[in-house]
Amino acid sequence: MSGRGKGGKGLGKGGAKRHRKILRDNIQGITKPAIRRLARRGGVKRISGLIYEEVRAVLKSFLESVIRDSVTYTEHAKRKTVTSLDVVYALKRQGRTLYGFGG
């Protein structure tokens, strides 16, 4: 142990600075067949071509709000790791209770 307390780098040598990949337009990773499979699971038979971009936009805004709330819970607990309970509580706050992950 280096004696620097919980999670602190302290003085002296820090870790290597890593280059982070700049993420842009990752929502396109939700492919057309993936959206089609989700719709099929929901009982949809035919899908308009305009739906795919709309679904991506709705999914992105939903995930942004859940992640924002989850990170708020994490920061309040003075942690750096988002836990499954943080996500469960964030979903519960938005009125979408999720069972099976504790809490």
Curated annotation (Swiss-Prot):
Signal peptide (UniProt feature, chain positions): none
Compartments where found: Nucleus; Chromosome
Annotated region (Disordered), positions in chain: 1-20
Positions carrying Phosphoserine: S61, S65
Modified positions (N6-methyllysine) in chain numbering: K6, K9, K13
Record keywords: Acetylation, Chromosome, DNA-binding, Methylation, Nucleosome core, Nucleus, Phosphoprotein
Post-translational modification: Glutarylation at Lys-92 (H4K91glu) destabilizes nucleosomes by promoting dissociation of the H2A-H2B dimers from nucleosomes.
Modified positions (Omega-N-methylarginine) in chain numbering: R56
Modified residues (N6-acetyl-N6-methyllysine): K6, K13
PROSITE patterns assigned to the protein according to its UniProt record, in alphabetical order: HISTONE_H4 (PS00047)
GO cellular component: nucleosome; nucleus; RNA polymerase I upstream activating factor complex
Quaternary context: The nucleosome is a histone octamer containing two molecules each of H2A, H2B, H3 and H4 assembled in one H3-H4 heterotetramer and two H2A-H2B heterodimers. The octamer wraps approximately 147 bp of DNA. Histone H4 is a component of the UAF (upstream activation factor) complex which consists of UAF30, RRN5, RRN9, RRN10, and histones H3 and H4.
UniProt similarity note: Belongs to the histone H4 family.
Protein name: Histone H4
Species this chain originates from: Saccharomyces cerevisiae (strain ATCC 204508 / S288c) (Baker's yeast)
Gene coding for it: HHF1
